[in-house]
Amino acid sequence: MDKYKVLLVDDEEEAIEAIRLKLEWETLGFEVIGSANNGVKALELVERLQPDVVITDIKMPYMDGLELARALNEDYQNIHIIIFTGFDEFEYAKEAVHLEIEEYMLKPINSQELSECLKRLKKTLDNEREEKLNVKKLEHYFNAVSYTHLTLPTKLEV
């Protein structure tokens, strides 16, 4: 099965590299497909790369992580968002809950904690993928049944 695509967003290149190197992404069922150093660039990459997951910092220039999350929720409802930050502020956490963020983590990122988060997220993504597949199967079935009904004669002659 295909790996789920992840976009990393942080204005600190070292943070992106640390996250990229801390995990065995492939083993967890994910692949890092790109990174951006602010929310504006992240939106451009989201449009082009269509990630399943965006992992973003909050404090960044031009567009912060919460603004990015708002934009993603508006235009890309299927993308799951994980926020990490160095700021332990209640208002950020409250806004993250309001935006239905998948997970809110404090820096420095603990690889075990992020790994567990991604395992839970993979189960969610697998379930979503399975539901979409089931819907397609049902649509195919109902289309076939509808077609069959359309081709039957409306009047039987004896």
Description of each model-found segment:
Residues 6, 49-55:
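Active-site beta3 strand of CheY-like receiver
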Residues 38-41, 64-67, 85:
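Acidic catalytic/metal-coordinating carboxylates
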Residues 13-34:
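Two-component/phosphorelay signaling modules centered on CheY-like receiver
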Residues 97, 103, 109-153:
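Interdomain helical linkers/hinges and coiled-coil/dimerization scaffolds
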Residues 44, 66-77:
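Short amphipathic alpha-helix used as the core "switch/output" element in two-component signaling
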Residues 10, 57:
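Active-site residues of response regulator receiver
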Residues 60:
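Receiver (REC) domain active-site loop signature in two-component systems and cognate sites
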Residues 27-37, 45, 93:
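Short hydrophobic/Thr-rich beta-strand motif most characteristic of the beta2 strand and flanking loop
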